[in-house]
């Protein structure tokens, strides 16, 4: 099976939980032995672990034709993407995007992470997804969280392939009810267009069903997992707390959601 995956971050450049989750599911799918993953990231740096997936640098995918040679493309983007892919993507530009702010390669730049113009970058990412979806071969689309839902929808409309969205958190979780209407609309649009909705917990699944009015039959709880501790860590002697004051460890962010 070939998976076209849309992510927003990936180790070692971790801005939030998405990077770790994206890495984990990529490694897990790759370990099955019969899954090939093409992972689209807005701004990879070139030092990402590519053992489990092919990484597409969305900031190096052209949306406007530029007459450049192979050596120049190699010089500009060779550290993050195969120059041959640049020319393959260039052959699948589907509209005149010269009115957009593009660089000398006809590509759009991304800040990486979560900049102040995040909604603009989400929209730009979805435009580029149309080029990638027309160029790659895949059987299913996997989109991580609301940031990539528009890209996943675009890829589905282009290809007709099923869309599986991965809900790591909803805006109800992040805001505890004070929902951003723009974010909510993007989330709901992604869910409405999805063929399968993966939720990280049963609580999230119930939120998706009741707050976003989704069919329970396409919503599944897919719990996050943890890596086994290294043996050297398991061998660390446990402290003796008998007779001492009880200690509670909280491992998480100090947010309403946690």
Label the model's feature ranges:
Residues 130-135, 180-197:
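Membrane-proximal helix-turn-helix segments that form the acceptor-binding/catalytic region
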Residues 28, 34-133:
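A conserved catalytic-core segment of Leloir-type glycosyltransferases
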Residues 203, 225:
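Carbohydrate-associated surface elements
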Residues 141-142, 192-202:
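A short beta-strand/loop micro-motif in the catalytic core of glycosyltransferases
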Residues 9-21, 50, 258:
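A short, glycine/small-residue-rich beta-strand->loop->alpha-helix junction that serves as a flexible
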Residues 3, 140-142, 149, 153-174:
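Active-site proximal beta-strand in glycosyltransferases
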Residues 240-258:
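Conserved donor-binding/catalytic core segment of Leloir-type glycosyltransferases
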Residues 1-15, 40-45, 58-60:
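Nucleotide-activated donor-dependent transferases that construct or modify glycoconjugates
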